[in-house]
């Protein structure tokens, strides 16, 4: 899962959106650095990552990547799940339009920015002003996201080519998304994530 899915599931679980978004920028034990609600959100994010990576649908989807891109398949798929969530948001969350949700999420996250790591602050400078969560529905933007990640981290250069795997398996990936994401929404609503 990437930014949008983590925020969405956190909202459904009544967990800290801030903690769920911040988690990838925090190493080790967060208890000494953040308030309890943010810590709980960080832990929820980590549980979701482990759960998602081990779902049969996600394991199967990783196998569709070519040898030269399979190493980055988990990252690429995380971004792709956000694409499908953004694209189908009105079906999955009909009572909370994506643009409104984005504003709500931004307000929640802004409360912790002063005490956040610089890389997280930098992400937030772009995430909200450039409307990433809404733009995830556009596959050209997904390609741009993957290229940007590859540019910032040369060891992830294969992300550039992983775009072709997404394109080749788009329909099958969308089917897998519909198989697992509604289940995760239900688990989040029951606070079982």
Curated annotation (Swiss-Prot):
InterPro entries: ACP_PD (IPR007431), ACP_phosphodiesterase_gpbac (IPR023491)
Catalytic reaction annotation: holo-[ACP] + H2O = apo-[ACP] + (R)-4'-phosphopantetheine + H(+)
Alphabetical GO biological process terms: fatty acid biosynthetic process
EC number: 3.1.4.14
MF GO annotations: [acyl-carrier-protein] phosphodiesterase activity
Keywords: Fatty acid biosynthesis, Fatty acid metabolism, Hydrolase, Lipid biosynthesis, Lipid metabolism
Pfam families the UniProt entry points to: ACP_PD (PF04336)
Origin superkingdom: Bacteria
Function: Converts holo-ACP to apo-ACP by hydrolytic cleavage of the phosphopantetheine prosthetic group from ACP.
Family: Belongs to the AcpH family.
HAMAP family: AcpH
Name of protein: Acyl carrier protein phosphodiesterase
Organism name: Escherichia coli O45:K1 (strain S88 / ExPEC)
Gene coding for it: acpH
């Amino acid at each position: 899962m990437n930014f949008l899915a983590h925020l969405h599931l956190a909202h459904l679980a009544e967990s800290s959106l801030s903690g769920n978004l911040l988690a990838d920028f925090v190493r080790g034990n967060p208890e000494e650095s953040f308030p309890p609600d943010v810590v709980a959100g960080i832990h929820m994010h980590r549980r979701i990552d482990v759960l998602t990576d081990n779902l049969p649908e996600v394991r199967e989807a990783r196998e569709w990547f070519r040898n030269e891109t399979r190493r980055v398949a988990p990252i690429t798929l995380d971004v792709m799940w956000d694409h499908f969530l953004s694209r189908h948001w009105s079906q999955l969350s009909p009572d909370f339009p994506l643009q409104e949700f984005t504003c709500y999420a931004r307000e929640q996250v802004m409360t912790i920015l002063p005490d956040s790591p610089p890389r997280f602050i930098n992400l937030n400078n772009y995430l909200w002003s450039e409307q990433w969560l809404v733009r995830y529905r556009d596959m050209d933007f997904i390609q741009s996201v993957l290229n940007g990640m590859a540019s910032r981290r040369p060891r992830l250069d294969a992300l550039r080519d992983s775009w072709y795997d997404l394109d080749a398996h788009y329909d099958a990936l969308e089917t897998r998304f519909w198989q697992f994401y509604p289940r995760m929404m239900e688990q989040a609503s029951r606070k079982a994530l």
